[in-house]
């Protein structure tokens, strides 16, 4: 397996994003922050001996979801985003999903010697979600969370599945994420991101060979 790290920058007229990722966790840093004088403090920040997670998108609940995804995937992750939040949350959420997907794909490298498929369940109180992923190079997303509110915090509920769809498209994976039950939209969303993390962690884990896990012989 390779070092499995990546640094991705995405700059458009709508957002400026920088993401560093290590799929194996461990120390991680960005040499030059996009924030002037480090003026923005991460809403979702955690540092342990095994992981460094620092997320600042400008949308608190999105930070919380990305933090949960990184934590339970076993990643170290730094996300910096300056977006046009004076308009709404669409561009920031979508572009963060795209950039994170690109970073994940680059860090993963060739799909070789890994399980490829992964599945996971995660509860959060009354909510229960299921996720299934395939590192297939066939981007597709089916996301059914059954959210009822207009927003959770400052994040529009319609953008929560859209983030996952953008991540799947950019990372070129297939993912199915369903919330099976739950009454609270915060819980439904968080259990979904945690279930996805469990599935990704399994799919990217070594399978004991150096083979490409495909009858085609290639996943590219």
UniProtKB/Swiss-Prot annotation:
Residue numbers binding Mn(2+) 1: 64, 91, 186, 190
InterPro entries: IGPD_sf (IPR038494), ImidazoleglycerolP_deHydtase (IPR000807), ImidazoleglycerP_deHydtase_CS (IPR020565), Ribosomal_Su5_D2-typ_SF (IPR020568)
PROSITE patterns in the cross-refs: IGP_DEHYDRATASE_1, IGP_DEHYDRATASE_2
A GO MF label: imidazoleglycerol-phosphate dehydratase activity
Record GO biological process: L-histidine biosynthetic process
Entry annotated with the keyword Manganese: yes
Source superkingdom: Eukaryota
EC number of the protein: 4.2.1.19
Induction of its expression: Induced by histidine starvation in a GCN4-dependent manner.
Residues that hold substrate according to the record: 14, 64-72, 90-94, 116, 138, 186-194, 214-216
Cofactor: record remark: Binds 2 manganese ions per subunit.
Reactions this protein catalyses: D-erythro-1-(imidazol-4-yl)glycerol 3-phosphate = 3-(imidazol-4-yl)-2-oxopropyl phosphate + H2O
Record annotation: effect of changing residue 92 to A: In strain: YIIc12 and YIIc17 haplotype Ha1
Family annotation (Gene3D superfamilies): Imidazole glycerol phosphate dehydratase, domain 1
SUPFAM superfamilies: Ribosomal protein S5 domain 2-like
Any Pfam family hit: IGPD
Cofactor requirements of the protein: Mn(2+)
Enzyme class: lyase
Alphabetically ordered keywords of this record: Amino-acid biosynthesis, Histidine biosynthesis, Lyase, Manganese, Metal-binding
Pathway terms, separated by semicolons: Amino-acid biosynthesis; L-histidine biosynthesis; L-histidine from 5-phospho-alpha-D-ribose 1-diphosphate: step 6/9
Additional remarks: Present with 2100 molecules/cell in log phase SD medium.
UniProt name for this protein: Imidazoleglycerol-phosphate dehydratase
Record organism: Saccharomyces cerevisiae (strain ATCC 204508 / S288c) (Baker's yeast)
Phylogenetic placement of the source organism: Eukaryota, Fungi, Dikarya, Ascomycota, Saccharomycotina
């Amino acid at each position: 397996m390779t070092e499995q790290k990546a640094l991705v920058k995405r700059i458009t007229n709508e957002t400026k994003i920088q993401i560093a990722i290590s799929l194996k966790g461990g120390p991680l840093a960005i040499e030059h922050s996009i924030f002037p004088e480090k003026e923005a403090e991460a809403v979702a920040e955690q540092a342990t001996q095994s992981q460094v997670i620092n997320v600042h998108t400008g949308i608190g609940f999105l930070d919380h979801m990305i933090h949960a995804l990184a934590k339970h995937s076993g990643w170290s992750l730094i996300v910096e985003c300056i977006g046009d939040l004076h308009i709404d949350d669409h561009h920031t959420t979508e572009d963060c999903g795209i950039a994170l997907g690109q970073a994940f794909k680059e860090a993963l490298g060739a799909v070789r010697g890994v399980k490829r498929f992964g599945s996971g369940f995660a509860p959060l109180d009354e909510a229960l979600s299921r996720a299934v992923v395939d590192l297939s190079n066939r981007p597709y997303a089916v996301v059914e969370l059954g959210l009822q509110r207009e927003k959770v915090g400052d994040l529009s509920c319609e953008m929560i599945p859209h983030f996952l769809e953008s991540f799947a498209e950019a990372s070129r994976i297939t993912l199915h994420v369903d919330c099976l039950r739950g009454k609270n939209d915060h819980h439904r969303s968080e259990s979904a991101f945690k279930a996805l993390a469990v599935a990704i962690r399994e799919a990217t884990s070594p399978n004991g060979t150096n083979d490409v896990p495909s009858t085609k012989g290639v996943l590219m």
